[in-house]
């Protein structure tokens, strides 16, 4: 059963009010019955009776789980499918991932819920567009068209929703005539579901942004249950996209914003509230949702869940970090499902038919999208595998949607002609993307320095979005690695300033600095991290040396915090082209074969530092 959208007045939410609402919500939540009940099924393949303990206002009691026939009369199931960080990954690769396959899985789930009187809710947690030619050549239009057909109920606005900037080829405004959010607003206007942004604040009004079809929250009807959905984005949003496209915006704290908006939704009649949060975490084991030992305990979405008053938010669809989550934190189910259209998350909310409130929940591991599966392990199998069987889900074979394929076809055809263009170069060994120093990261930095003719290049590991396979270089492969339309910038740093920039990055989490033209050795001394720099020929860089540095407009504007230790930046020049285009031109003129061993070995690192990031020098 599809969720049907329902118009509502969101109420006035000021930034000042969001910060002050926590105590009010905490007291109100005591009056919300039935929201603190939790049930986890320990093993879905060996169902057995479980004991459910219900905490109510005046007394606690325990009862045996109802029989299936009684459950059918008294409860219904709302299955929530959560996606995030599609990044334009609309297509399957070798029978894995893509929106046509997602539609096949969702159709099977909808059929299952229709048969038992429940419903399905499809929610996205942001970063829908940026990342592939299929999406970027039309500024995300193809993603919205496919999401409309899939029947999404809502999508959060993530940091990369701002990447396209104004409508047209430029990624940032050229002048006052350009709306820095033009492309985002156009995509929202095309959507048959709302874009949610409760904590993205217009500084001129101190209220959440109110662009056409962009709002803090929505209420939808799922099998007769009024479900509220609140959208929020990571506190790092403004430093994780183009600064020119977020001028005049602020990000309100996530937990107070969620609490305030969820309370308003309940006052407006929602009996279930879900958060769609472009904020994430990382877990690696999914057998037991209550076991958090494989999860990073201090991750943003876990801090948010623990800060929420009990019973205000029933569940969270998370994203941003590109990792899996299928866990319960502070009594709240949280799911997240990697990136690039690889998988989806799911939790089932068991809802009392009379009260409309959640009585229990089930959390499912991230589900990979597969056309075929291994008959023994049921894991995804290659299409070419002779023993693979068609995948099944909810007791039915999964069939990729021909309707979705037809929607994607024009964008796929347009991208194909661009992707196939050969460049004058070859990659000898597969190069993998990581958030540590890598051969691929060093190669991208080398390309950027060579293209700009600079002394040094500074890039960021977060800007590298795909592995680079062995074989001939094509524009499509280069584009997959560097999909952002960041402009090539040059600026001047002294040796002392560059040392400061590198030391700062090594002492923080997040995107790693990528360098070309110098090698940095860092060591702790007297409680400080001290960095020594050498030029590639071996000469030490002095504090007063002036270096011409190639970088991107994203980093020059403070992105990822890499260049923020130096302010103001000097001699900044826009070189008039996109970084990727400059690299492609240079490869075409100076092409050769690149080997991994030339770019990184244990003895030939560009960043040498004690331990792991973030480096701490105050430890004994």
Regions found by a protein language model. Give the residues of each.
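Bacterial N-terminal signal peptides that target proteins for export
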Residues: 28-51
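Acidic, metal/ion-coordinating pockets
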Residues: 40, 62-377, 381, 435-447, ...
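Catalytic centers of hydrolytic enzymes
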Residues: 76-79, 88-89, 95, 103-105, ...
């Amino acid at each position: 059963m599809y969720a049907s959208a329902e118009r509502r007045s969101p109420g006035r939410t000021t930034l000042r009010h969001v910060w002050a609402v926590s105590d009010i919500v905490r007291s109100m939540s005591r009056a919300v019955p039935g929201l603190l009940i939790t049930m986890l099924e320990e093993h879905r393949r060996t169902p057995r009776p479980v004991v459910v303990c219900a905490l109510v206002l005046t007394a606690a009691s325990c009862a045996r789980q109802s029989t299936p026939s009684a459950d059918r009369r008294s409860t219904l199931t709302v299955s929530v499918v959560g996606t995030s960080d599609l990044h334009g990954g609309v297509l399957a690769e070798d029978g894995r991932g893509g929106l046509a396959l997602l539609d096949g899985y969702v159709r099977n789930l909808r059929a299952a819920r229709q048969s038992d009187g429940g419903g399905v809710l499809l929610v996205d947690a942001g970063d829908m567009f940026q990342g592939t030619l299929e999406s970027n050549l039309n500024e995300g239009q193809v993603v919205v068209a496919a999401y409309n057909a899939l029947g999404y109920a809502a999508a959060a606005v993530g940091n990369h929703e701002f990447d396209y900037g104004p409508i047209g080829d430029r990624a940032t405004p050229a002048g006052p005539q350009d709306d820095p959010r033009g492309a985002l607003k156009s995509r929202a206007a095309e959507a048959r579901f709302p874009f949610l942004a409760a904590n993205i604040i217009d500084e001129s009004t101190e209220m959440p942004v109110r662009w056409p079809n962009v709002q803090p929250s929505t209420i939808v009807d799922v099998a007769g249950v009024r479900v509220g959905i609140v959208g929020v984005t990571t506190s790092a949003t403004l430093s994780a996209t183009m600064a020119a496209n977020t001028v005049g915006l602020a990000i309100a704290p996530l937990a107070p914003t969620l609490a305030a908006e969820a309370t308003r939704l309940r006052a407006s009649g929602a009996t279930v509230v879900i958060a769609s949060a472009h904020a994430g975490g990382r877990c690696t084991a999914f057998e037991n949702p209550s076991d958090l030992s494989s999860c990073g305990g201090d991750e943003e979405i876990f801090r948010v869940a623990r800060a929420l008053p009990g019973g205000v938010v029933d569940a969270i669809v998370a994203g941003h970090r590109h990792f899996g989550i299928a866990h319960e934190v502070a009594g709240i189910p949280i799911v997240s499902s990697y990136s690039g259209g690889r998988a989806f998350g799911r939790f089932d909310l068991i809802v009392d038919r009379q009260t409309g409130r959640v009585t229990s929940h089930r959390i499912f591991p991230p589900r990979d999208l597969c056309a075929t599966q291994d008959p023994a392990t049921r894991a995804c199998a290659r299409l070419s595998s002779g023993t693979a069987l068609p995948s099944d889900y909810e007791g039915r074979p999964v069939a990729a949607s021909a309707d979705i394929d037809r929607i994607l076809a024009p964008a796929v055809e347009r991208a194909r002609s661009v992707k196939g263009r050969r460049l004058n170069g070859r990659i000898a060994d597969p190069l993998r993307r990581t958030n540590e120093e890598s051969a691929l990261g060093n190669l991208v930095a080398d390309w950027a320095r060579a293209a700009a003719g600079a002394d040094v290049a500074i890039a960021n590991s977060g800007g590298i979005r795909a592995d680079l396979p062995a074989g001939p270089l094509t524009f499509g492969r280069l584009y997959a690695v560097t999909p952002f339309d960041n402009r090539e910038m040059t600026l001047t740093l002294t040796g002392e300033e560059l040392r400061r920039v590198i030391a700062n990055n090594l002492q923080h989490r997040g995107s790693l600095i990528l360098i070309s033209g110098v090698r940095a050795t860092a060591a702790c001394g007297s409680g400080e991290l001290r960095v020594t720099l050498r030029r590639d020929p071996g000469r030490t860089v002095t504090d007063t040396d002036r270096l011409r540095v190639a970088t991107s407009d994203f980093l020059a504007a403070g992105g990822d915090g890499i260049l923020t230790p130096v302010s103001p930046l000097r001699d900044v020049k826009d070189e008039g082209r996109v970084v990727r285009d400059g690299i492609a031109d240079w490869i075409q003129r100076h092409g050769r074969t690149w080997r991994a061993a030339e770019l990184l070995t244990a003895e030939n690192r560009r960043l040498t530092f004690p331990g792991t990031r973030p480096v701490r020098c105050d430890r004994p």
